[in-house]
């Protein structure tokens, strides 16, 4: 295993956002987290990268775990000139070759000299993906990374992510509020609404009564699901107590 959450809870003031979450992520596994707006999906990812401190529970991490993170959006001050190359060398200086390779992996080659504020939403998401891939992550976190992309852009984005996974064996946690889009090779879907409502293969979750009740679906609604081959995993790491 790469990462395990045990009874993890997060509060904002008196408001309980995540309630006793238990999740384990294996090497090479793709996990998709779905849920309505305000269900705690983004909070969960921010907790995993250490941006939010849980009030209780523990996070167990594999030794020397490297995590890459692609946020929903990046707010850029239009008055601040910054090229893609400069952005990708902060805070760590990297060679032109390394930057170029990361952009190719993310499906947006040759934009090193462009200004960040000149990029389209889809282009910026790919640059953010390139930034995450620079870390050579063992675990890649995607927070609604395809939001704003059209269908072709979404498919292409996922293809580049899947190619990176096959190349490196990294695991992926992908967050989405779009109930009808599940990455082709998803091993497991977790339905979240403050608590874990249900989880399992895409086929299992799409037929779960809890899933249908939460999202107001009936039997005529279709979730895109795919056959897949589960990954086998081993764990060697340490426990981080946070509560």
UniProtKB/Swiss-Prot annotation:
Residues 3-218 form the ABC transporter domain. The keyword Zinc applies. It is found in: Cell inner membrane. Its EC number is 7.2.2.20. ATP binds at residues 35-42. The complex is composed of two ATP-binding proteins (ZnuC), two transmembrane proteins (ZnuB) and a solute-binding protein (ZnuA). This is Zinc import ATP-binding protein ZnuC 2. It comes from Aliivibrio fischeri (strain ATCC 700601 / ES114) (Vibrio fischeri). The gene is znuC2.
